Structures are given as C-alpha cells and as structure tokens.
Amino acid sequence: MNSMIRYAAGAAACLFLAVAAGQDVYRRQISLFLPAAFLLPGLFCCLWRLAMEGEDLYMEAAALLPGCGLCLLAGLSDGKVGWGDGLCTLILGLLAGAGPCIFAVSAGLLLLSLLCVFLLALRKADRNSRMPFLPFLAAGYILYLLFD
C-alpha cells in the first residue's frame, strides 16, 4: 500500500508540474487556483509520510525549505523571482518530500544555468532576460524519478 501511495504522489507531482510549467511558459504567470487545488493532496501525502511511513518531522519541514526560500527571494527581489515559482516548489515539497524536492530544485537550477550560459554565449539573451523556472523544475523532478 505504501508504494501505491508513493506512485500516486509521484503522478500527482508530475501532473502538477506539467500544468504549472505550461502556464509558466505560455502565460508567464501561474494561476493561484493550481497550487490551491494541489494543496490538499500535498497535505495528505505529507501526513501519510509522517503517520504511516514514520518520516521524521524535521524531514517534512526540510521539504518546505526550498519553496520558502524561493518565496523569500520573490519578496526581496522585486519580481526577479516569481511568487508562483515559490508556491509551486512548496507544493512539490508537500507532494514528494524533502529528497525529491531538493533534488528537483538543484537539478532545475543547474539546467537553467546551463541554458542561460549557452544563450549568453550566443548573445541571444542578456543579464536582464527572463526565463521560466518551472519547466526546469519539472525536468529536475523527472530526472529524480529516472534516477530513483
């Protein structure tokens, strides 16, 4: 049963990230309805890991740190980092847990950095160019699923 819940949580996270990435690419903003719709399943997954799998409370709190950090950056950076990126990372932390969330954020930032360096080298972008983060977060989560 535990593995079935894990697969359902992974599928929910993939669906969530796919829709959020599409909104981020095409609309350059995330509908507030999307994170709100996945908040309840995320809380269920978090409580399931705490109650049934014996996950440590500190690990569940650590799953929220990347999202909290991005929300803090969104508030401090005058829109350079979007609030939707932080909210979606918080929901990913609730759905997937600390390890997958931290891996996805790290891999997503690495992939985004590589693309930015490539575009800067080709002079297709400058330091003020805006890039959507959520497609790279989704790619980072898919990489986690492939390597897990």
Placement of each model-derived feature along the sequence:
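A membrane-topology feature that recognizes alpha-helical transmembrane segments
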Residues: 1-148
